[in-house]
A protein has these predicted regions:
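Structured, non-membrane catalytic/scaffold regions adjacent to prosthetic-group chemistry
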Residues: 2-202
Length: 202
């Protein structure tokens, strides 16, 4: 019995070079995943603090943060649950701008991001500086919705998205690494999607 006509099965779709190993393109969707109930945070009461190993601990209220130099990120994001979303557009302020005001001490090597809910995640200082991380309040030209971390979330797009803490209120600089919520529960300390660092030992 003859097999299928040549070309009937079509060509295998080439993998997008922007897609890390083990990920799939979620398209226009943006799945909602949280470690805790979604809080209701008013912009009028929100603030962001940089403290810990810094010369000048500093807090910015909503209006004060919006007066800082605007910064944007246009690119891709990747979730540890294997979805990736291409061509996102976020706006807010660069973490570099916040740290320039607070002035990290020479012995600061790590950062713990804390959410309004108490959720925490740890990051090496080098992964949130040098134009690699932002505190954002806009998505796709409008306010960031609460289910996606609004009014304000951390954005560290080169790492798996659990590192981009939703409803962020504090960045604490530290001399030593201190695991956050998911890291204490078996997730990788760094979370590089290109190295598939999903869990401890990966």
């Amino acid at each position: 019995m003859a097999g299928p006509t040549r070309g009937f099965l079509g060509r295998r779709r080439e993998r997008d070079p922007r897609l890390p190993p083990g990920q799939y393109d979620v398209g226009r969707d943006w799945p909602v995943l949280t470690a805790e109930p979604t809080p209701r945070v008013s912009p009028e009461t929100w603030s962001i603090t940089v403290d810990g190993r810094v010369e000048d601990p500093t807090t910015w209220a909503w209006d004060e943060a919006h007066r800082l130099p605007r910064a944007e990120y246009r690119g891709d994001i990747h979730c540890v649950t294997t979805w990736s979303k291409f061509d996102t557009w976020f706006a807010g302020v660069s973490v570099d701008t916040l740290f320039e005001a607070a002035r990290p001490t020479a012995d600061a090597h790590f950062v713990v991001a804390t959410s309004k809910t108490g959720y925490t995640t740890n990051l090496p200082l080098e992964d949130v500086t040098g134009g690699r991380a932002w505190v954002v309040w806009e998505y796709d030209g409008g306010p960031l919705h609460v289910e996606h971390g609004g009014p304000v979330r951390l954005l560290v797009p080169h790492l798996y998205f659990w590192k981009s803490a939703k409803w962020v209120t504090k960045l604490t600089l530290m001399t030593r690494d201190q695991q956050g919520f998911w890291e204490q529960n078996g997730y990788h300390d760094l979370g590089d999607p290109w190295r598939q660092q999903r869990y401890q030992g990966d």
